[in-house]
From Swiss-Prot:
Source organism of this protein record: Staphylococcus aureus (strain NCTC 8325 / PS 47)
HAMAP family, per the entry: Ribosomal_bL35
Tree of life domain: Bacteria
Keyword line: Ribonucleoprotein, Ribosomal protein
Protein name, as recorded: Large ribosomal subunit protein bL35
Residue spans of biased composition, Basic residues class: 1-16, 38-49
Gene Ontology molecular-function annotations: structural constituent of ribosome
Residue ranges of the region described as Disordered: 1-49
Length: 66
């Protein structure tokens, strides 16, 4: 059986925090800002943590990433 590889697409989008949680950036932030409210644009700037339901799958994609 070959070794598992780190999923490079996921590795570029997620960073591990000091406590081991995974931090991700928000979607919908590249264009079409004219029809988004100021509040929505401000909230999109903040990073979020990967949800508990997705954590197992994402950790499997990032098998060797520290």
């Amino acid at each position: 059986m070959p070794k598992m590889k780190t999923h490079r697409g996921a590795a570029k989008r997620v960073k591990r925090t000091a406590s081991g949680q995974l931090k991700r950036s928000r979607a919908f932030t590249s264009h079409l800002f004219a029809n988004k409210s100021t509040k929505q644009k401000r909230q999109l700037r903040k990073a979020r943590l990967v949800s508990k339901s997705d954590m197992k799958r994402v950790k499997q994609l990032l098998a060797y990433k520290k």
